[in-house]
């Protein structure tokens, strides 16, 4: 076994031992309760006035109407 192979074997062995010890210490336990909700909760956002809107409920004003854009095309935009 040459030096490079020995180094790789030691690196893999250290990684496996590290993962096993982290598991015994509870390092891989999932978040529970409010912590998980706080991490994955999305903040409510709305589309400001003048921006294109796909749905009425996404506009801050709750109103989405057809308007002419800079090219003269009719697009839905938040009021």
Swiss-Prot record:
Annotated signal peptide: 1-22
The keyword Transcription appears for this protein: no
Chief location: secreted
Residues the record marks as site: Critical for insecticidal activity: 52, 69
SUPFAM superfamilies: omega toxin-like
Tissue localization of expression: Expressed by the venom gland.
Localisation per UniProt entry: Secreted
Gene Ontology annotations for the cellular component aspect, listed alphabetically: extracellular region
Disulfide bonds listed in the record: 46-60, 53-64, 59-78
Domain of life, source organism: Eukaryota
Keyword field contains Signal: yes
Molecular function GO terms recorded: calcium channel inhibitor activity; toxin activity
Gene Ontology biological-process entries: defense response
Family designation: Belongs to the neurotoxin 08 (Shiva) family. 01 (omega toxin) subfamily.
Function: Inhibits insect, but not mammalian, voltage-gated calcium channels (Cav).
Name by which UniProt lists this protein: Omega-hexatoxin-Hi1e
The organism's taxonomic lineage, starting at the top: Eukaryota, Metazoa, Ecdysozoa, Arthropoda, Chelicerata
């Amino acid at each position: 076994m040459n030096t490079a192979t020995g180094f790789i074997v030691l690196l893999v062995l250290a990684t496996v031992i590290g993962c096993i010890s982290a598991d015994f210490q509870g390092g891989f336990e999932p978040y529970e309760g409010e912590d998980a909700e706080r991490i994955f909760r999305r903040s409510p956002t709305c589309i400001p006035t003048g921006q294109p809107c796909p749905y009425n409920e996404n506009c801050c004003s709750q109103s989405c109407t057809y308007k002419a854009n800079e090219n003269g095309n009719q697009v839905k935009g938040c009021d």
